[in-house]
Amino acid sequence: VKQQSAQAQLREAAPAHLPRTPLNVIPAALVSASGFLLFAREDRVSGFLLLAAALVLAAMISRRLVIDLALIGVGLTAMSLVPITTDISTEHMAVMGTAMILAVGIPYAASRFLTKDHAIRFPIRTGQPWTRAEKWYLPAVLLIGYALMPVYMIRTGVYNNWPAVSDPEGIARLFLGTNVLGIWDELFFICTAFTLLRRHLPDWQANLLQAVLFTSFLWELGFHSWAPFFIFPFALLQARLFTITKSLSYIVGVHLLFDFVLFLVLIHAHNREWIDIFLY
């Protein structure tokens, strides 16, 4: 009975594909471009102007389209109004954490209680067992992270964009911040932005546009140098995995495995005698 209930909830969670027109991609792409300006370029004025233009254009096409793009815009706006950094002070974590809650919470609440279509969902228990390939991908993620993250973080010096910590409290704060941000990435870029976009666009278009947002945000956070060359494909794959598994827990698990390696690399990079297990 429980499994049947979970499967029913899973079917309900599938996003409704609304009537589409090829024009939908234009305002959607402008929203994605506004995220690039807001985060990667840190050009707030141009970003907000482009976002406004996208919503005006969307309103000319479809009422439902402008609502869904506006929900994404709310999240982008909430995050763009606070400093997006790796600062782990209590003050900054509270400010950025509040923005993260609003960026996910407002679109979810609007979808659930105002439009009442409940388009945004966070499916944790799907009732579907993971396939063998999905299970094997998890340890593969650790190996990929082990091979990639030390080379990227240390050789480029990008690790300096994160605070150097060596005391227990600092290490705990870094661990918490890294993991919370990883979970939020999946809640907003995949469960919110991608889900809303794919109601109006083919999956491949929605995926490309959310990956631009995902990559732009992490660039502002501190993933500079050649990070977009692996973050963009990672974002594409995460959305694809979510489409296949319909499981938030799975994509969060994948992300947190990468983040665990990132955390260890950061500790080692700032304290070279610690966790000396990496090749770079």
Question: Across the structure, where does each feature detected by a protein language model lie?
Answer:
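Alpha-helical transmembrane segments and their cytosolic membrane-interface
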Residues: 1-48, 151-152, 173-178, 196-200
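Alpha-helical transmembrane segments
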Residues: 18-36, 70-78, 138-146, 207-210
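Alpha-helical transmembrane segments in multi-pass membrane proteins
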Residues: 36-114
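Membrane-embedded alpha-helical segments of multi-pass membrane proteins
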Residues: 44-54, 97-105, 171-176, 184, ...
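Membrane-helix interface "capping/anchor" motifs
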Residues: 57-72, 198-199, 203, 242-250
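Juxtamembrane helix-loop-helix connectors linking adjacent transmembrane helices
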Residues: 87-100, 109-181, 272-278
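Membrane-interface helix/loop boundary segments of multi-pass membrane proteins
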Residues: 126-130, 183-209, 243-247
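Functionally important transmembrane alpha-helices
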Residues: 207-211, 215-217, 223-280
